């Protein structure tokens, strides 16, 4: 069974550079490569009957009876372990990313244990497919996932986010059948690694907090709260382990200090705040840099020269060989609703790729992003994997080439996006969608060709650096 170990970044509309809401996540797998694709699920393609592959959980048809909306997704292309839709934006400009694998503790597992997959229940395989096509607001996502978790249960610990043009909500599942959610303030950002992240919680503030109806009673009845005052959900339901200090907390610490150099602290800090404010407005480039980061300019950078070999292996970076798909789901507020939804997407290790902004009001995706299960250099997923594995052999040489490639690609995509926004201003219906499909194709071709060019530059630079060589000076 695949489990993804991700890094989620959330940015409220007053914290972003252009007034948009942004929810982002890197989808990281394990030692086996998991090819990811990009597709549009049109209403006629949405399942009317659904059974999970992993848990064999059958969903009651009544829970799929509502007319589904069109939505984008980034599924596993093999389908062997289910759909794993990962992230997308639907026709009502509601976005969802799911899931972040998070932590738990023995106290709550002794009260409401997660299910064994043999018992049924839902997991990361299922949530996007069963949720996103039925949402008309971000809070609808909280309500629907809460309902599904209470009814069917879950065999995993899950974190997920929902957004519309105004609001972002982050939800975490608790045990097998409970959940909590918090609205992210408009002027705030969140960094959520693979641990239970929500901290302070106000049961009396229904505008900003939501939960399974019996959760407060459950906390009190089973004496789950270690704090003398208030409710800190990370303390109650989460973890504070040595693994957190090496695997989770350092990722958050590094990005907090990138967004606010006065943040301070140490990488292992267990109580880093969930809700934070940056010292500037946050851009797409900031989020991509964060999702690509590997502790640059610290002793913990595996590519750097400041640390010892031991220090370089101390903490897990965000940018890693196991990044298979990364997205930023952006709902813009300065353009018409028909072009407001943008799914920024990249495949492969983030340190060596570039994102591009796909319009989501479309009915199909570029061929290069419809990944094949087997290696195929016509597909951007496999081209990025090859580029990253070559780049990793000598980052000092290849890193500057990648930086130039990424800046060039982002600039070209921004230009295409600006031009398209203006060109389609007075269009609607199929004519509009056709223009957006064409713009997506143009950006896809641009980034694909730039990646091929980068690979060629890396081959040129690396020719003289091979170990197997013998120079004849004659």
Curated annotation (Swiss-Prot):
Temperature dependence comment: Optimum temperature is 55 degrees Celsius.
Descriptive protein name: Dipeptidase A
GO biological process, one term: proteolysis
Main enzyme class: hydrolase
Pfam families, alphabetized: Peptidase_C69
Catalytic activity: an L-aminoacyl-L-amino acid + H2O = 2 an L-alpha-amino acid
Active-site feature positions: 6
Gene Ontology molecular-function annotations: cysteine-type exopeptidase activity; dipeptidase activity
NCBIfam families: C69_fam_dipept
pH effect on activity, per entry: Optimum pH is 6.0.
Its EC number(s): 3.4.13.19
Complex formation: Homooctamer.
Assigned keywords, A-Z: Dipeptidase, Hydrolase, Protease
Family: Belongs to the peptidase C69 family.
Cysteine pairs bridged by disulfides in the record: none
Native source organism of the sequence: Lactobacillus helveticus (Lactobacillus suntoryeus)
The protein's role, per its UniProt record: Hydrolyzes a wide range of dipeptides but unable to hydrolyze dipeptides containing proline. Highest activity against Met-Ala.
Regulation: Inhibited by Zn(2+), Cu(2+), Ca(2+) and Cd(2+).
């Amino acid at each position: 069974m695949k489990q993804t170990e991700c890094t989620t970044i959330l940015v409220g509309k007053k914290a972003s550079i252009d007034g948009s809401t942004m929810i982002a996540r890197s989808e990281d797998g394990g030692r086996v490569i998991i090819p990811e694709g990009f597709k549009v699920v049109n209403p006629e393609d949405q399942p009317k009957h659904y059974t999970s592959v992993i848990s064999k959980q059958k969903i009651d048809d009544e829970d799929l009876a509502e007319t589904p909306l069109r939505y984008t997704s980034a599924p596993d292309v093999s389908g062997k372990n289910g759909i794993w839709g990962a992230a997308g934006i639907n026709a009502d400009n509601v976005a969802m990313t799911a899931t972040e694998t998070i932590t738990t503790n023995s106290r709550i597992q002794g009260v409401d244990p997660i299910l064994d997959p043999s018992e049924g229940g839902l997991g990361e395989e299922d949530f996007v497919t069963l949720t996103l096509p039925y949402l008309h607001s971000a809070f609808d996502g909280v309500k629907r996932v809460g309902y599904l978790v209470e009814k069917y249960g879950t065999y995993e610990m899950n974190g997920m986010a929902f957004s519309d043009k105004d609001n972002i909500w982050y939800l975490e599942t608790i045990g097998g059948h409970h959940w909590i959610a918090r609205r992210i303030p408009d002027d705030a950002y969140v960094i959520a690694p693979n641990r239970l992240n929500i901290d302070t919680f106000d049961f009396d503030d229904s505008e900003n907090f939501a939960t399974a109806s019996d959760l407060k009673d459950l906390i009190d009845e089973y004496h789950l709260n270690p704090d003398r005052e208030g409710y800190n959900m990370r303390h109650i339901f989460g973890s504070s382990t040595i693994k957190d200090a090496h695997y989770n907390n350092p990722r958050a610490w590094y990005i907090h200090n990138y967004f606010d150099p006065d943040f301070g602290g140490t990488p292992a800090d267990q109580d880093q705040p969930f809700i934070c404010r940056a010292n500037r407005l946050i851009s797409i480039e900031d989020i991509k840099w964060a999702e690509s980061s590997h502790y640059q300019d610290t002793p913990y950078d595996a590519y750097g020269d400041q640390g010892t070999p031991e220090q370089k292996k101390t903490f897990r970076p965000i940018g890693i060989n196991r990044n298979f798909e990364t997205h930023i789901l952006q709902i813009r507020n300065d353009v018409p609703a028909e072009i407001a939804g943008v799914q920024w997407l990249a495949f492969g290790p983030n340190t060596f790729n570039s994102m591009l902004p796909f319009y989501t009001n479309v009915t199909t995706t570029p061929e290069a992003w419809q990944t094949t299960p087997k290696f195929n250099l016509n597909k951007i997923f496999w081209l990025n994997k090859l580029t990253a594995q070559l780049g990793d052999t000598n980052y000092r040489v290849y890193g500057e080439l990648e930086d130039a490639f990424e800046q060039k690609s982002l600039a070209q995509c921004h230009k295409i996006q600006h031009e398209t926004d203006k060109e389609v201003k007075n269009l609607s219906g199929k004519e509009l969608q056709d223009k957006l499909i064409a713009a997506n194709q143009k950006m896809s071709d641009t980034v694909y060709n730039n990646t091929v060019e980068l690979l060629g530059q890396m081959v040129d630079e690396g020719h003289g650096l091979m170990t197997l060589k013998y120079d004849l000076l004659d």
